[in-house]
């Protein structure tokens, strides 16, 4: 193995992570432990400020479907919990794995293709939004 691949594989075997629903409950997220903890703390802080039944219900489902203290198997693979996979991906066997900001997203390929088509359809608006952000950044400098 190339040294970089070997290091990444060793890192995966050593590191622990959380397998949970993604925020929209349409796919699976693989969070580094610290990212997951910050996410939960954020929602807990919001709920302490003002109790909200919807947020409490969301967090109850989110936490009950989260698998903490996960690690790669001896071959460096991530094994998705069967119940979570079934609930989030249904019977789909083909999945796409994508980096999504601070976590990995595992989604059914068929759903991902629909999202990709929507993304492509809105690409001009996305570029315009990026241009606007860059213009705002130039003004700060």
What are the residue ranges of the model-derived segments?
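Single conserved hydrophobic/aromatic residue that forms the stacking wall/gate
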Residues: 1-13
């Amino acid at each position: 193995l190339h040294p970089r691949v070997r290091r990444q594989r060793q890192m995966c075997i050593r590191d622990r992570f959380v397998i949970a629903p993604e925020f929209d409950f349409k796919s699976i997220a693989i969070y580094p432990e610290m990212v997951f903890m910050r996410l939960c703390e954020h929602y807990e802080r919001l709920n302490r400020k003002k109790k909200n039944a919807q947020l409490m219900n969301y967090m109850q489902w989110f936490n009950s479907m989260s698998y903490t203290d996960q690690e790669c198997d001896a071959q460096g693979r991530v094994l998705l919990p069967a119940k979570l996979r079934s609930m989030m991906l249904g019977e789909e066997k083909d999945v796409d794995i994508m980096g999504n900001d601070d976590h990995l997203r595992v989604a059914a390929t068929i759903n991902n293709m629909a999202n990709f088509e929507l993304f492509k359809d809105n690409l001009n608006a996305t570029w315009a939004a990026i241009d606007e952000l860059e213009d705002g950044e130039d003004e700060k400098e």
